[in-house]
């Protein structure tokens, strides 16, 4: 019997984009291999700005239907501008471009090792320095028997921006939230405030509440970041189970970010921010490991504060987050010029 032939596309016009797909805790990551324009700019924030203003078609083509879906997440690899960086990355989603994404870092750590983007891999861990728009992230990829595995990474300085902030949320009244930064800014509030449970309530109800909180915080709270105004925006709202005091038992949360996008993982940058918040409140100590459970899939990350530092005038911590990513496939996408839906679309 002859070996099966790999599927081949017939002749077509328009560009072709090659990608590798992975997931971390159920949250997808689509990594662009080829076909994307080379972003202009000296710094990674300038490259992010250039892509947003000049090549947003790439995000829409790969994230939106019919090639993606409204909860797809992507990564475009770019040269880093820091000497220590092995790779740089721009993150993309249904609304635009993030500054940090922990689940993507876990996946990209494996990817960088497996695709030879770092020096020869060696056990028990191989270091991968990934420059994100928020700064340099140091990832450590377990490596045994020629196979990459779990990944841990150390965050940029994470801090509590404001605690016990009262915002008026239409339809819900006055709601008290905390705001923290873990590479991106999040609002945190217990789902119990709204009579919901992060693990058992309908996803639609969790999304509606989170979206309302996000819009209210955006309208009523001015954020700032010591390093750049490009970092000073609210990425989303994380609903928690309210179990913030230290425990060996997992604590659950669910993150609704960007344009009501639901994170299937426990949210790496959200775990970072939540650890920083718990440390700020004196609920945990350095090196105390907490386990975080996704309310969407039940997948787990672990996190701990490893050292104190500063971010401008904010007292901050460096947080270590650990997780596992898996490959799901590799694809080539085409854009046929006569296709009226070639640019992508989203259903709401």
Curated annotation (Swiss-Prot):
Its EC number is 4.2.1.77. The active site is at 101 (proton acceptor). Keywords: Lyase. The keyword Electron transport does not apply. Substrate binds at residues 102-103, 263, 268-269. The keyword Lyase applies. It comes from the Eukaryota. One of its GO terms (molecular function) is trans-L-3-hydroxyproline dehydratase activity. It catalyses: trans-3-hydroxy-L-proline = 1-pyrroline-2-carboxylate + H2O. Homodimer. Belongs to the proline racemase family. In contrast to the T.cruzi proline racemase enzyme, lacks the conserved Cys at position 267 which is replaced by a Thr residue, transforming the racemase activity into dehydratase activity. Catalyzes the dehydration of trans-3-hydroxy-L-proline to delta-1-pyrroline-2-carboxylate (Pyr2C). This is Trans-L-3-hydroxyproline dehydratase. It comes from Xenopus tropicalis.
């Amino acid at each position: 019997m002859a070996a099966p032939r790999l599927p081949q596309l017939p002749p077509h016009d328009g560009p072709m984009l090659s990608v590798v797909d992975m997931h971390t805790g159920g949250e997808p990551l689509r990594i662009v291999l080829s076909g994307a324009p080379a972003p202009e700019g000296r710094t990674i924030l300038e490259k992010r700005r250039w892509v947003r203003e000049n090549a947003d078609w790439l995000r829409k083509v790969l994230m939106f239907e019919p090639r993606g879906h409204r909860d797809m997440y992507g990564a475009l690899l770019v040269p880093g501008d820091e000497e220590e960086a092995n790779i740089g990355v721009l993150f993309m989603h249904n609304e635009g471009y993030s500054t940090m994404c922990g689940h993507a870092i876990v996946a990209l750590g494996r990817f960088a090792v497996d695709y030879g983007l770092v020096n020869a891999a060696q056990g028990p861990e191989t270091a991968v320095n990934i420059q994100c728009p928020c700064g340099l992230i140091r990832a450590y990829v377990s490596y045994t028997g020629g196979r990459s595995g779990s990944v841990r990474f150390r965050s940029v300085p994470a801090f509590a921006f404001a605690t016990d902030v009262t915002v008026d949320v239409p339809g819900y009244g006055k709601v008290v939230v905390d705001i923290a930064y873990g590479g991106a800014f999040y609002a945190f509030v217990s789902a119990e405030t709204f009579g919901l449970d992060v693990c058992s309530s309908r996803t639609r109800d969790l999304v509606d509440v989170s979206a309302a909180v996000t819009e209210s915080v955006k309208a009523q709270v001015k954020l700032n970041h010591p390093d750049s105004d490009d970092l000073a925006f609210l990425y989303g709202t994380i609903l928690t189970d309210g179990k913030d005091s230290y425990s060996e038992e997992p604590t659950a949360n669910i993150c609704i970010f960007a344009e009501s996008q639901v994170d299937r993982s426990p949210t790496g940058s959200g775990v970072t921010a939540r650890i920083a918040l718990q440390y700020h409140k004196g609920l945990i100590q350095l090196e105390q490991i907490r386990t975080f459970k996704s309310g969407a899939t039940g997948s787990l990350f672990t996190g701990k504060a490893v050292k104190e530092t500063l971010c401008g005038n904010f007292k901050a911590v460096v947080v270590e987050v650990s997780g596992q990513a898996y490959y799901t496939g590799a694809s080539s996408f085409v854009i046929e010029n006569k296709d009226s839906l070639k640019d992508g679309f989203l259903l709401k």
